[in-house]
Amino acid sequence: MEDYTKIEKIGEGTYGVVYKGRHKTTGQVVAMKKIRLESEEEGVPSTAIREISLLKELRHPNIVSLQDVLMQDSRLYLIFEFLSMDLKKYLDSIPPGQYMDSSLVKSYLYQILQGIVFCHSRRVLHRDLKPQNLLIDDKGTIKLADFGLARAFGIPIRVYTHEVVTLWYRSPEVLLGSARYSTPVDIWSIGTIFAELATKKPLFHGDSEIDQLFRIFRALGTPNNEVWPEVESLQDYKNTFPKWKPGSLASHVKNLDENGLDLLSKMLIYDPAKRISGKMALNHPYFNDLDNQIKKM
């Protein structure tokens, strides 16, 4: 830690306080995440340190790079590249009645997918994607932050400040208690973020797990074994769930053209095995008119 100076506290992440800092010799500005773990007394589990060390190898233009892992007084500090703005703050800053430019929505979605495909190809899941951990710079680049932390530290039910961790972007298989899940959980989250890029509003903003599920069911219909084999045997599936009929996504998501709605519907397919993959999503016709500069990144 002696290599870094803390400049100021910039926020509270899922796992602890985040500081803006500076490397004393290079002058590089960094984000310093102090990780608070549930079992403080025992120090940091070696499994977590192993997991985190692997993340230093995830180098991609759309991934916030982990530059250093430091221990101080049995506290773990993760040193990341610094970006000053997250997607939630940016969406909140757009004036009422105005929306993000449709070409920027497309560019951001493409970049998010590029980042996720890179990580998925290295068998790393995110599991907790949301606008707060998508960081943007002033050059139109968006980067995914906090990759792999869920596996290293688990996802707490509450942030250490007792704020509830958001469920809005969580996939139905996770909400229904599936013990086995994989890369499609991230695609679902990206689908809900895609809708929010277009509308500025969260697509499904539940305030509890059951409310979250019911909001999804009201929009997309209550799933059963016909549309999603085995769903009825998932741990938290109840035969007493109200049976909603599928509605139309277009009524929930204005501002997306036909191709955009088609891609969104493929990202929000109930059956994880049928949900579009990141790689397939990048080749969807929605991106046909995207600037080649972005495709080359």
Curated annotation (Swiss-Prot):
Keywords (A to Z) from UniProt: Acetylation, Apoptosis, ATP-binding, Biological rhythms, Cell cycle, Cell division, Cytoplasm, Cytoskeleton, Host cell receptor for virus entry, Host-virus interaction, Isopeptide bond, Kinase, Mitochondrion, Mitosis, Nucleotide-binding, Nucleus, Phosphoprotein, Receptor, Serine/threonine-protein kinase, Transferase, Ubl conjugation
One function term, GO molecular function aspect: protein kinase activity
SUPFAM superfamilies per UniProt: Protein kinase-like (PK-like)
SMART domains given in the database record: S_TKc
Induction notes from the record: Follows a cyclic expression; during interphase, accumulates gradually following G1, S to reach a critical threshold at the end of G2, which promotes self-activation and triggers onset of mitosis. Induced transiently by TGFB1 at an early phase of TGFB1-mediated apoptosis, but later repressed. Triggered by CKS1B during mitotic entry in breast cancer cells. Down-regulated under genotoxic stresses triggered by PKR/EIF2AK2-mediated phosphorylation.
Cross-link (Glycyl lysine isopeptide (Lys-Gly) (interchain with G-Cter in SUMO2)): 6, 9, 20, 139
Pfam families per the UniProt record, alphabetical: Pkinase
Protein's name according to its UniProt entry: Cyclin-dependent kinase 1
Taxonomic source organism: Homo sapiens (Human)
